[in-house]
UniProtKB/Swiss-Prot annotation:
PROSITE patterns: RIBOSOMAL_L16_1 (PS00586), RIBOSOMAL_L16_2 (PS00701). Disulfide bonds: none annotated. It comes from the Bacteria. Belongs to the universal ribosomal protein uL16 family. Gene3D superfamilies: Ribosomal protein L10e/L16 (3.90.1170.10). GO terms for biological process: translation. Keywords: Ribonucleoprotein, Ribosomal protein, RNA-binding, rRNA-binding, tRNA-binding. CDD domains: Ribosomal_L16_L10e. It comes from Bartonella henselae (strain ATCC 49882 / DSM 28221 / CCUG 30454 / Houston 1). GO terms for cellular component: cytosolic large ribosomal subunit. The gene is rplP. This is Large ribosomal subunit protein uL16. Binds 23S rRNA and is also seen to make contacts with the A and possibly P site tRNAs.
């Protein structure tokens, strides 16, 4: 699963996702993409589940790019532990995704295959998404 090799600090604040995505809103690598429509934190497990669903449907043809990376440590305290005594330990890693952000890109496959692969991948994610494609020039 995806996670940073090392970080400057072990724990971070929750933070909020305001407005639309500042960068990563255009297709840079592939011809087809999956774009987020609403803000959410997406975990490394969800990214991996979506990637597996996409690559499994593509059957080793084409190429997949993951455009988001889980760099936010999410902490939690053990069950049945009283409040206080400091912040919990890091439980998992997540990526903040703002509306308009491209999460996955595909290339080297027909449009109908890409559309279905990204639909299956989107089913593994907790947000509404939209299929986009590069405009033929």
């Amino acid at each position: 699963m995806l996670q940073p090799k090392r970080t400057r600090f072990r724990k971070q604040f929750k933070g909020r996702i305001h407005g639309v995505s500042k960068g990563g809103t255009d297709l840079n690598f592939g011809a087809y993409g999956l774009k987020a429509v609403e803000p959410e934190r997406i975990t490394a497990r969800q990214i991996e589940a979506a990637r597996r669903a996409i690559t499994r449907y593509m059957k080793r043809s084409g190429r997949v790019w993951i455009r988001i990376f889980p760099d936010l440590p999410v902490t939690s305290k053990p069950t049945e532990v009283r409040m206080g005594k400091g912040k919990g330990s890091v439980d998992y890693w997540a990526a903040r995704v703002a509306p308009g952000r491209i999460m996955f890109e595909l290339d080297g496959i027909p449009e109908d295959v890409a559309r279905e692969a990204l639909r299956l991948g989107a089913a593994k994610l907790p947000i509404k998404t939209r299929f986009i494609q590069r405009i033929a020039e």
